[in-house]
Amino acid sequence: MPPCSPLSNAYGYPLLIKHLLTRSNIASACQEIVSGTEMRLSYADLDQRVRQLANALKVSGIREGMRVGVMDWDTHRYLECFFAIPMMGATLFTINVRLSPAQVLYTINHGRPDLIIVHRDFIPLVEDIKSGFDRDIIIVPIGDGKGYEEWIDAAPDSFDFPDLDENQTATLFYTTGTTGNPKGVSYSHRQLVLHTLGLIAGFGAWPGNAGFHRGDVYMPLTPLFHVHGWGFPYAATMLGLRQVYPGRYDPDAILGLIADENVTFSHCVPTVLSMVLDHPNCSQTDLREWKVIIGGAALPRSLQTRAATAGISLHAAYGMSETCPFLTVADLSSDDPEVQAQTGFPGPLVDLRVVTSDMQGVPHDGETTGEVVVRAPWLTQGYLDNPQASNDLWDGGYLHTGDVGYIRENGSLQITDRLKDVIKTGGEWISSLILENIASSCYGVEEVAAIGCPNAKWGERPVLAVQIKDNTDRDLVRLNIVEEIQMRVDVGEISKWAIPDEIIFVDHLPKTSVGKLDKKLVRQDVLTRLDLKS
């Protein structure tokens, strides 16, 4: 039977971000959104302020198709930008303020925003790099006081958000540049709406109080510039949850908000959780109702034990910038530490495979490893103005994660390694290649390998294995490397987190059969020398 012809007056409902706000404004109009200690507003207020922000941007010259950058902490202002900017047809460009100044400048020039909303804490950074801007950009300075409020208060609270093409770009951000310059990743309205529905289904379909539900009090502890705060602000808003935004991360303030606002659900990288657990007030704070999703780096067993002792329900999840990010989550109903730390089960609509180099699937035996490749309706379709990297990302019709893992008989995934030797420290990624290039330029260095060594607090820390030239003073080589890396940090070329913890001298660096550094053997040697376990 042929499909029915669409009626001329039928409404083809587009999947748009504005629809995520509709239900909460009706069913949760009086529900509260808290921003640090400075602001409390209802969902009805949020709806009005989103319209005022859109009008303020329009008065500033922003039109459909333009890009608006944001440099702010995790605040109600950022949440308002999550909606107002894409809803008016512009692109929300979340600028990663943790990149080095040189990388921030690169992303701004490459991403080409027409206007940037800048919190006063980041004005010095903008002042330092603006001479390198390759185009005129409107800068709107804001702060925790009157600046932002006066800006939007002067704007009307009525704005007719258009019915956009659901495939229109809604957001843009940049990867952390582990293999060269950061890459631009964008998402459409359709992708973000489907990701929101996937999050709600994937994290909500668990018995009892496990997971992410209508009764939770939500507080993000992942920067909102990082993959839309993992997408949870959109999901929390669609569900009409009580939301708490902590501003600049401070462990004392975070603990205070958890206690005062009865926060029950957060997500973060291991370093942030470690920071909270290390604070003296942690032992005086009741954390037994706090559910935390850990991602961005491997979950150290020691951190998992400390969290359990504090009464925190801790589970792992997995994704990446190019996947919006949700791909898998551990069994949220389990209290078994081994299960809680697993990479977990694919989310709804996620087609996940582990394959060989020629894209053949491997057995689901809990042992055979391969590269993790995925399909889902919310994956990025490529990198901004980078066709070669985009083709590589989607080689064979699946998105290549670059992660190595295996699938258990029950269908759950476990990540075991990275195809490329990126170093993950505190949720930040450091390029081993950049460190190697810097060190190899120093006096007396014959060859060098940068690897990540396990660290209970940071997940990994960089270590250099250095082969020096004959008749060279090791102490002088060490001094030169340290000074050169510190100089690169001082000028903003690399992050301070890239400074290696150790420099180890070796007689030779092992090679593979094709003459490349054998990082696996280097790592084994370094771990043995440092008496560490992988």
Where would I find each of the regions flagged by the language model?
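ANL superfamily adenylate-forming
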Residues: 123-166, 193
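Conserved beta-loop-beta connector loops within the AMP-binding
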Residues: 351-373, 409-410, 472-478, 518
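Conserved pre-ATP/AMP-binding loop-to-beta segment of ANL
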Residues: 29-31, 156-174, 180-181, 207-217
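Conserved AMP-binding/adenylation subdomain of ANL enzymes
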Residues: 193-217, 225-264, 279
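AMP-binding/adenylate-forming catalytic core of the ANL superfamily
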Residues: 99, 105-106, 116-120, 266, ...
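Conserved AMP-binding/adenylate-forming
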Residues: 13, 37-39, 54-102, 429
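Gly/Ser/Thr-rich phosphate-binding loop
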Residues: 238, 263-268, 277-338, 351, ...
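Conserved AMP-binding A3 loop
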Residues: 42-44, 170-198
